[in-house]
């Protein structure tokens, strides 16, 4: 592969190359066992593997319920395998542009065709014209379509059939297991939201393809620079079309309302770049140049500036500005991996939604004992029947916020004529009951299924970027 950095204008920046730095040695120490950081995952034979969860038609299940379960997971080979996979993906794209001269392999192209099919469903299912800042109901229709079609599409993909080949017999249940990860990569259809846990599901989907030997190690760079980048662009389209809420947003004290991995992978792309430094994200000329088409990190900054036009980067993304003060991209990438371990893989609210079955297994460690404090702190997993549940302090889609004036103008007449109506996304309206507006205590109410909510966490929880 060739790079075109010398053909791109430098904007007057000085060379930033440090050829003595060994990034592999640095990030290997972030693995569970640095000697195994480059080891391949445990492979399985999709034709002979014994599926788990047969009683649930092979669909992968959630196994991390408590802090004890999460600590047990962190001691397992599955956790090490997942973390190493992410580190390997990052290492394999170091210094490489999205515009590099790729040779697209047959299986990578098959995944592109599959994603294009799911992308077409967005075109086929336009958003409904409704009055809400908290997600468009058409996302549920799109999600249901994806759930229905994904097992068949994956079966044809993995068995080298044309994607839309009719399937006369029932799809083997192992494909339902793999489908679970891809289906849950797009967000939550009940809450109509999206966050880093859904992004992690897409990585698990790619890991499944590696473990069944559909993808080879030499294709890892294509998984990120082509497949993950395609996924990222699809997610932006979904977020913009259906106004997905950010799940578990840290507000201004987070990297991004929705994503984490584009910053991790994107920082690796920029390691030892001749001109672009971390502080370059504060230069509008660079951010709005062709560099943002080549590097995910800069592309994220440009996208944030586009959709959050109400203030400067410092005002709406101070953490990104803080990170821009780091000396070089290798330290940024190292910090991103540390932060991903602590803020994603180390957080129960995210990891309790991770799926396990026969390909990606939950391996319990009986030596990990749940403490009395952890037992007392146990809370039920929060579930919702629909996004209009008003039981928690939710963050509206930034796309909805950007279009507030347009919505208010188009709905003002209707609002004046229907003063007694309840706006979707502001209150619960099942059985004409409204949720308490204070939400300062546990409560129950009926949304076709009873569910409990503990007190909500602070709306903005600051994350810290690890530099040491």
UniProtKB/Swiss-Prot annotation:
GO terms for molecular function: peptidyl-prolyl cis-trans isomerase activity; protein tyrosine phosphatase activator activity. Pfam families: PTPA. The keyword Cytoplasm applies. Residues 412-424 have a biased composition (Low complexity). Its EC number is 5.2.1.8. Keywords: Cytoplasm, Isomerase, Rotamase. The keyword Ribosomal protein does not apply. It is an enzyme of class 5 (isomerase). InterPro entries: Phstyr_phstse_ac, PTPA_C_lid, PTPA_sf. PPIases accelerate the folding of proteins. It catalyzes the cis-trans isomerization of proline imidic peptide bonds in oligopeptides. Acts as a regulatory subunit for PP2A-like phosphatases modulating their activity or substrate specificity, probably by inducing a conformational change in the catalytic subunit, a direct target of the PPIase. This is Probable serine/threonine-protein phosphatase 2A activator 2. The lineage of its organism: Eukaryota, Amoebozoa, Evosea, Eumycetozoa, Dictyostelia.
